[in-house]
Amino acid sequence: MILFNKDYAEDLEYMKRGLADGILSEARLEEAVTRILAAKAALKLPEKRIAGTLAPKRENLDVIGCDLHRAWAMECADRAVTLVKDTQHLLPIDPVKHHRVLFEILGKCPSEKRVAERFIADMERKGFEMIPYEEEVFDFSKPMRFETVEEFRSKYDLVVYIGNVENASNKTTARLNWHAPYGAGNNIPWFVEVVPTVFISLQNPYHLLDVPMVKTYINAYSNHDLMIDAVVEKLTGRSEFKGVSPVDPFCGKEYLRY
């Protein structure tokens, strides 16, 4: 068994040459083979192969997504969502008081469309008017006019961010990136003192480090549809927050608590 090889036949030939040249000892090769065979024996793979149970039968897949499993998933989501802080006493949000919601999703991951559509649909069913953020076109070669504070205030009653920055192989960071050259536009949360703002992380529980100005912050740990549903239930006060953070969402920074 050779792991992480570029070409199996090539690596097998290298191993044979190493054995012939004395770089690889017979004892080391025997040890490696013994470990592999022992692992298979411990898992009873030979017996399962003989019994025809090495791979589950296709009909066993029917259990996936059954009512019991869905109930477990809903319970996990309900118990996981964590209110990290709400120092502005914003929650629960109300579809009358906070009717017009500017919605911004960050991450640009493959799941973004699904996540956004699920969250928007959940919120609209609760009676909110969801207004998705549209990236501005910046052309600094000519004079540009940006919204004034009062113009922004008059358009929105609430701003909701969703951090959907998924971890991936060879992805070296899971930080937030903004569509805001020189701090321009409405992607970066300059307006937290103007319009109530809440940040929800569906992946990385440490995003508060990148949005220290946000006063209401929620960690949900997963962008599964049922987790999104649970977040909306808690945002609107239909379910209480039960989650206990498994990490330090304040990243050891006292100022992030406020």
Report residues per predicted region:
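Preference for extracellular/luminal or secreted protein segments
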Residues: M1-Y258
